[in-house]
């Protein structure tokens, strides 16, 4: 029986973090396409699923941080639009 801790270390070494959001989404699309073929062994499918979860979490984190940055940047620039104000101009 394999030790869990060494297995986790091996998977981390095999799957480095993605370079950026676009790289992560491209890899995720490849994983999904590979799994949809139905040609993967159960072990390979499970490994691919785990990597997919890692990539999804990475992408969600990037999107969340980006949304927060946009809200901060737009905080002073956003004004409520009123058609009456626009027509008066």
Swiss-Prot record:
Lineage top rank: taxon: Bacteria
EC number(s) given by UniProt: 3.1.11.6
UniProt KW Cytoplasm keyword: yes
GO molecular function: exodeoxyribonuclease VII activity
Catalysed reaction, written as an equation: Exonucleolytic cleavage in either 5'- to 3'- or 3'- to 5'-direction to yield nucleoside 5'-phosphates
Location in or out of the cell: Cytoplasm
GO CC terms of this entry: cytosol; exodeoxyribonuclease VII complex
Keyword Hydrolase appears in the UniProt entry: yes
A GO biological process held by the record: DNA catabolic process
Pfam family, one: Exonuc_VII_S
Main location (coarse class): cytoplasm
Keywords: Cytoplasm, Exonuclease, Hydrolase, Nuclease
Region of interest called Disordered, as start-end residue ranges on this chain: 1-22
Family statement drawn from the similarity comment of this UniProt entry: Belongs to the XseB family.
Self-association state and partner proteins as the record states: Heterooligomer composed of large and small subunits.
HAMAP family: Exonuc_7_S (MF_00337)
Role played: Bidirectionally degrades single-stranded DNA into large acid-insoluble oligonucleotides, which are then degraded further into small acid-soluble oligonucleotides.
NCBIfam families, sorted: PRK00977.1-5, xseB
Record-given protein name: Exodeoxyribonuclease 7 small subunit
Organism: Nitrosomonas europaea (strain ATCC 19718 / CIP 103999 / KCTC 2705 / NBRC 14298)
Source organism phylogeny: Bacteria, Pseudomonadati, Pseudomonadota, Betaproteobacteria, Nitrosomonadales
Protein encoded by which gene: xseB
């Amino acid at each position: 029986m394999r030790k869990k801790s060494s297995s986790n270390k091996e998977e981390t070494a095999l799957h480095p973090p993605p370079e950026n959001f676009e790289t992560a989404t491209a890899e995720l699309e490849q994983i999904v396409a590979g799994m949809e073929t139905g040609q993967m062994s159960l072990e390979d499918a499970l490994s691919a699923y785990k990597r997919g979860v890692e990539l999804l979490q990475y992408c969600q984190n990037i999107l969340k941080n980006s949304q927060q940055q946009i809200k901060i940047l737009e905080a002073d620039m956003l004004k409520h639009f009123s058609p009456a104000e626009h027509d008066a101009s």
